[in-house]
Regions:
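Short, glycine/serine-rich, charged loops/turns that create anion-binding
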Residues: 11-13, 72, 94, 134
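Active-site/ligand-binding-proximal alpha/beta "capping" segment
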Residues: 60-102, 110-113
Length: 140
């Protein structure tokens, strides 16, 4: 993982602004640094500032994108079969992205994929997807 780009969605519970948003970003950057130190990783992911989904899709230009969606027919493992070196992964808030936000992500080129029959918490879904991706790429 090279970057973390938090997005503000309609269903997002946390809505920090101003100094509070900057403090949260700094906190998560420190968490990323500590995690890298613990596991011996020499490249620290950059944690970006919080932006609305609508603003995020205007700047997203990755060639391969997966949107985690419990309603998707395509399984995550199938979506990852043709991956190159980089991938952008989108995990929504606890209640999911709104229909408009999901449409914007799909229009931006995200492919919806499911992690299976269980609906996972947002933080669990993102970690499960990253772990599955590492396993599929032979990192385990």
């Amino acid at each position: 993982m090279a970057e973390v780009r938090p997005v503000l969605a309609a269903a997002s519970l946390a809505r920090p602004k101003g100094e509070r948003a900057a403090a949260r970003r700094e906190h998560w950057q420190k968490v990323a640094i500590a995690a890298c130190e613990q596991c011996g990783r020499n490249r620290i992911p950059q944690v970006h500032a919080l932006v609305p989904v609508e603003q995020y899709v205007l700047k997203e230009n990755s060639s391969q994108k997966i949107l985690l969606s419990p309603r998707a027919e395509l399984r995550f493992s199938e979506a990852c079969r043709t991956l190159g070196e980089s991938l952008t992964l989108a995990a929504g808030p606890e209640a999911g992205f709104s229909a408009a936000e999901e449409a914007a992500l799909l229009d931006c080129g995200f492919v919806p994929a499911s992690l299976g029959p269980r609906v996972l918490r947002t933080e669990t879904a993102a970690l499960a997807a990253l772990a599955a991706l590492n396993a599929l790429r032979g990192d385990f």
